[in-house]
């Protein structure tokens, strides 16, 4: 069982790699806890896959409650915690079985490492380690050095990026050329009740998604091409602010109808807020959004 809202490459892995190998995936709306519980009872899955903060609409499933249901069904819960990072949420402490992070993103944080991390308990460690040895999941020594260098400053960077994202999201809410803003700290967020419970430190991540008012793809491209400091890039979690167009990047493998069903519209962009002065990020967004 997997959440309907996932990173596009994760969706592709489940449907284009696992499915031909005989692993069926049932996609469920993880914003509906009863639907998740019913799906687990009906299908008795071998695993459950979800994200702490869903990409790109930043919905926040009730991880702790889903973990309890998974444990009751003796089903491993796999959580991608890349957006939230261990600074905000530690899924293993909430009952998850396996946690994955893109090392490329916040943990290394400088856009110069390609790698990932799997964190688990002793029960799953041995088979995962054997799989790693067989398939060659070994990071090179220099990449490992760069990653460890990045981890040393990770808390400082993350706190700054979270604070910046709060300011940017708040500013975007009142911009005349923005239709809707998606950010976990929004008091009107549909998952606000359990966001407070899951994010006790008051840090809500550095990702902000928003819809450009009345924009088609050409208008979105004009906005992104008008950015002077923020980099149009297919990544996130760097010290530099970056903007991505989900319809043409992270979720490009989905059909337009599939994206529409998920709520990923053609005027949606995803902003990874960096460590720059928040005023500079806001100024760049403002001039780009006002560009004809």
Language model region names:
Residues 15, 214-215, 241-292:
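PLP-dependent enzyme catalytic core of the Aspartate aminotransferase-like
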Residues 1-177, 182:
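Conserved PLP-enzyme active-site core in the AAT-like
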Residues 16-19, 134, 225-229, 286-290:
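Short, solvent-exposed amphipathic alpha-helical segments in soluble enzyme
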Residues 75, 114-115, 156, 179, ...:
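Structural beta-strand/beta-sheet cores of well-ordered domains, especially the beta-sheet scaffolds
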Residues 109, 141-143, 199-203, 261-266:
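Short, flexible turn/loop "capping" segments at secondary-structure junctions
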Residues 166-240, 254-260:
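Conserved small-domain helix->loop->beta segment predominantly found in fold-type I
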């Amino acid at each position: 069982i997997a959440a309907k809202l996932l990173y596009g490459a994760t969706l592709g892995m489940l449907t284009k790699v696992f499915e031909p190998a005989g692993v069926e995936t049932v996609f469920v709306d993880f914003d509906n806890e009863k639907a998740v519980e019913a799906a687990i009872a009906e299908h008795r899955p071998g695993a459950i896959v979800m994200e702490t903060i869903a990409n790109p609409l930043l919905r926040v499933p009730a991880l702790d409650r889903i973990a309890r249901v998974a444990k009751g069904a003796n089903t491993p819960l796999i959580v991608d915690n890349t957006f939230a990072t261990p600074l905000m949420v530690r899924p293993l402490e909430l009952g998850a079985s396996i946690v994955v992070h893109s090392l490329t993103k916040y943990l290394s944080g400088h856009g110069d490492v390609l790698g990932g991390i799997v964190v688990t308990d002793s029960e799953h460690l041995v088979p995962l380690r054997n799989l790693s040895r067989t398939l060659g999941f070994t990071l090179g020594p220099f990449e490992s050095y760069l990653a460890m260098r990045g981890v040393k400053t990770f808390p400082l960077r993350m706190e700054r990026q979270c604070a910046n994202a709060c300011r940017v999201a708040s500013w975007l809410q009142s911009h005349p050329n923005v239709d809707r803003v998606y950010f976990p700290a929004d008091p009107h967020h549909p998952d606000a009740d359990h966001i407070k419970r899951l994010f006790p430190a008051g840090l809500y991540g550095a990702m902000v998604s928003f819809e450009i008012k009345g924009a088609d793809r050409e208008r979105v491209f004009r906005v992104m091409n008008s950015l002077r400091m923020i980099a149009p890039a297919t990544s996130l979690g760097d010290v530099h602010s970056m903007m991505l167009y989900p319809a043409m990047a992270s979720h490009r493998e989905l059909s337009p109808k599939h994206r529409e069903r998920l709520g990923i519209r053609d005027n949606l962009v995803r902003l990874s807020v960096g460590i720059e002065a928040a005023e500079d990020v806001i100024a760049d967004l403002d001039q780009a959004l006002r560009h004809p």
